[in-house]
From Swiss-Prot:
Quaternary structure annotation from Swiss-Prot or TrEMBL: Tarantula hemocyanin is a 24-chain polymer with seven different chains identified.
Residues holding Cu cation 2: H322, H326, H362
Protein name: Hemocyanin D chain
Comment field (misc): The two copper ions bound each have 3 nitrogen ligands (presumably contributed by His residues) and share a bridging ligand (possibly contributed by a Tyr residue) in addition to binding oxygen.
GO molecular function, one term: chloride ion binding
Function recorded in the entry: Hemocyanins are copper-containing oxygen carriers occurring freely dissolved in the hemolymph of many mollusks and arthropods.
Protein family (similarity comment): Belongs to the tyrosinase family. Hemocyanin subfamily.
Gene Ontology CC annotations of this record: extracellular region
Amino acid sequence: MTIADHQARILPLFKKLTSLSPDPLPEAERDPRLKGVGFLPRGTLFSCFHEEHLAEAETLAEALVEAKNFDDFIALATNARAVVNEGLYAFAMSVAILSRDDCNGVVLPPIQEVFPDRFVPAETINRALKVDKVSDPNKDTVVPIQKTGNIRDPEYNVAYFREDIGINSHHWHWHLVYPAFYDADIFGKIKDRKGELFYYMHQQMCARYDCERLSVGLQRMIPFQNLDDELEGYSPHLRSLVSGLSYGSRPAGMHLRDINDCSVQDMERWRERILDAIHTGLVTDSHGKEIKLTEENGLNILGALIESSHDSVNKPFYGTLHNWGHVMIARIHDADGRYRTNPGVMDDTSTSLRDPIFYRYHRWMDNIFQEYKHRLPSYTHQQLDFPGVRISRVTVRSKVPNLIHTYSKDSLLELSHGINLKGHIQVKYEHLDHEPYNYEIEVDNRTGEARETCVRIFLAPKYDELGNRLILEEQRRLYIELDKFHRRLEPGKNVLVRASGDSSVTLSKVPTFEELESGNANVNPNEYCSCGWPEHMLVPRGKERGMDFYLFVMLTDYEEDKVQGAGEQTICSDAVSYCGAKDQKYPDKKAMGYPFDRPIQVRTPSQFKTPNMAFQEIIIQYEGHKH
């Protein structure tokens, strides 16, 4: 059977999951391999942050991965679809598809079409359901998306970012590729530097969010600091079609409260133990043995502890700080479940980015990681330099050199694959985008021989919310990675050109359900893995009058950076910076975020710069809505 045949048999299993029968298959009709699943009731919201939900998802994913061949896998998946919770099924099934060798090249259907109720406001879906009853089923009908707030709430100014379908889909897919329960011994594939990727991907989301806040005239976010902080209010305007209930809203001024499975005191205890480990440079494993946090492994160990994942060296002692925090915030309005309400959006990876507290909470997590980073020495001139290689000029080639235009545009989302409709109803929604551009890097190779180089490109705002120039130590945590790629430098002058659409951070194209069904998806199965930052959100919005940014370009020695066992032709090479390379080593020896991952003692770019670096001032200008 071909990849297309496998794709065609998998897609129907993701259709209409919001409309499954509430009653599971009787036990007598269940595959005996499904003995350990079916405990989370259908019609309730699944959370991959909740220990019990995660344990059941792990059991199902393992059973699906262990199916003896593809036909057996499809038979077991079909049986499981009629047994387990709807959200749990989609999660475990997706993890299994990404893990099975006979599913290599199969593209997961976009989660926004599988569960559109997680991405589209309830008012819009309600309108679509009404329109569907009276519209011609043979014609496409378009319903405009409804707004979820207004300018009385300053945070609504960045709703375009928080509610972006692409970034919420990215977060869902990242946690599929790196599920907390992942055990390499069972699934048989490595997840290299998983703990460090957990840190870096979320750190980058926070940096991007702050860039967007500065773009719309808001101050940078204030981190969540203490577990007794009062939280801001938030109403998601989402209603689950699986449960029939709205996602929980949070009035302003509420505090975290104990939930049935975890107390606020547990969270405080875990945080202090993790900080103790950072400050002593030692973690204690479950056998009482001390493990040193080195420059090479420290962040990876801490990432696993903080999340915490299967790789945590001592989960009973260091706890599950990140995951239980998500659940605790999501249940703040009904901590002990007495009102039988749905949790808030923080409970789910495909919805949590909508809530402003997500970014403040993750900046708190990032501050813990930064405690560790501050214990490492700053990079020396020798560690930063690439002797004999000098960047003479960097230019962004667009309509106007060193000026990138951004704008808002409309796109359509099909509802009929996820919701039981008689016709084709599409939602028209607005999202940020940017004009395509190229990086043009002029390099002088004075080594007298051809050299291989890794090109690293970052972007950060030049000024803070008050118009003051940011010093490098403040600015380094705002640097967002735009691209990283490998090139050969011939002796003498070289001009390196790279298109923005080729970024190692972004997904170039997300195929729709319809394109996957028809076989017209037009994606290279060896490159596409669903995990990656959306291409339309590569650069921040900027301001109508233009906003000043530093474009940072650095060339490093590829011979020092390359990793044994990380091939040039990687499976899923579309977005390796945030998602890694599937089943292979992370293709870069340097720390993620290098050279901005460690404290910087000097204040300005000119003091930090080595000849193999360039800080180019550019402007990003927002042009409004494009029809």
